[in-house]
Amino acid sequence: MNYFVLIAVACLLTAGTESKKDGYPLEYDNCAYDCLGYDNKKCDKLCKDKKADSGYCYWAHILCYCYGLPDNEPIKTSGRCRPGKK
């Protein structure tokens, strides 16, 4: 019985907590945001507008990378970029 109470309390404490993730945020067409010119300020602003902790321009891919994005924000995992498709 004590274990049940302990598990119930643990579930209540973790309910509603929001976890965060890192990754390349996506536009509507499954394309990541580019940062030509390695514009870290642009990427940081973009990421913070998406409720992330911070962001920067990843030079190897020339794409914006965000730290601490909310779970409901889509990130690049797989699939092709489909420019112009809504």
Swiss-Prot record:
This protein's name: Toxin Tpa4
Family to which the UniProt record says this protein belongs: Belongs to the long (4 C-C) scorpion toxin superfamily. Sodium channel inhibitor family. Alpha subfamily.
Residues with the Proline amide modification: 83
Function: Alpha toxins bind voltage-independently at site-3 of sodium channels (Nav) and inhibit the inactivation of the activated channels, thereby blocking neuronal transmission.
GO CC list: extracellular region
Free-text note regarding domains: Has the structural arrangement of an alpha-helix connected to antiparallel beta-sheets by disulfide bonds (CS-alpha/beta).
Tissue specificity comment: Expressed by the venom gland.
Any one biological process term the GO annotation gives: defense response
Subcellular location: Secreted
GO MF, one example: sodium channel inhibitor activity
Residue pairs linked by disulfide bridges in the UniProt entry: 31-81, 35-57, 43-64, 47-66
Major localization class: secreted
PROSITE patterns xref list: LCN_CSAB (PS51863)
SMART domains with a match to the protein in the record: Knot1 (SM00505)
Gene3D superfamilies registered for this protein in UniProt: Knottin, scorpion toxin-like
LCN-type CS-alpha/beta domain span: 21-82
SUPFAM superfamilies from the UniProt entry: Scorpion toxin-like
InterPro entries: LCN-type_CS_alpha_beta_dom, Scorpion_toxin-like, Scorpion_toxin-like_sf, Scorpion_toxinL, Scorpion_toxinL/defensin
Signal peptide annotation: 1-19
Keywords per UniProt: Amidation, Disulfide bond, Ion channel impairing toxin, Neurotoxin, Secreted, Signal, Toxin, Voltage-gated sodium channel impairing toxin
